[in-house]
Amino acid sequence: MQDLFSVAGKVALVTGGTRGIGLMIARGFAEAGAKVYVASRKQEACDATAAELSKRGTCIGFAADLGGEAGCRALAAKLAEAEPRLHVLVNNAGANWGAPLEEHPDAALDKLWNLNVKGPFHLTRALLPRLEAAVRPGDPARVINVGSIDGLHVPSLETWGYAPTKAALHHLTRMLARHLARRGITVNAIAPGPFESKMMAETLRRFGDSIRAGCPLGRIGEPEDMAGIAIYLASRAGAYVTGAVIPVDGGISTTL
């Protein structure tokens, strides 16, 4: 049983891994003994994160623009040069945008669909050879998509691109899970509620007290909460789970 939740020796790629949810997951993997690659748009941020996490484990950073297929293919090529196999892919890179309905720019919709939905699609497809190479009997390769509870319910804020793209990512997760199972790859999604991050900073500043009051567990998510669910899905403990969309929100989704 001591190895049930182990990810030691596994190779993981976490996109958007230099801050927020992605950094929480990357740090958890590194501290648990995985070899972690983080990807973000700026090489400086990747280098800083790699230096920090390498104090706890092994971490390498790659700059990547995942808002288009070419950037996803380029990242996959970098990873392929470095590793013969990839055990865990975490599609976390994403963006948000809020504006009144009458003012929401079309360019913002394009950006969010490209990064939040098409990015995970293109990157997963490009990395299939490395994921398949990691498959072992009883130990599938894992894809973990980071969605949102805003993709499970209708949010009160006018995030006209964000919430629909996260709902789409959840359904993409289910489709990939069905079709990749025969190739030894599980695909699941985490749907975070409120966590401390740059994306959530303004919302928590303005509404943090009311969010806590409305949360059945009475608090904001902590890094260990996010690392824990990712390690579960990436370990032997989660090997029989695929196609799941798991809220990690302190119970908020039960109240909506």
Feature map (PLM): residue ranges:
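Short C-terminal tail/terminal secondary-structure segment
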Residues: 2-4, 153, 231, 242-256
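Conserved glycine-rich cofactor-binding loop
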Residues: 11, 18-19
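Alpha-helical segment proximal to the catalytic Tyr-Lys
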Residues: 129, 178-179, 239
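Short, small/polar-rich loop/turn modules that mediate ligand/substrate recognition or access, typified
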Residues: 181, 186, 241-243
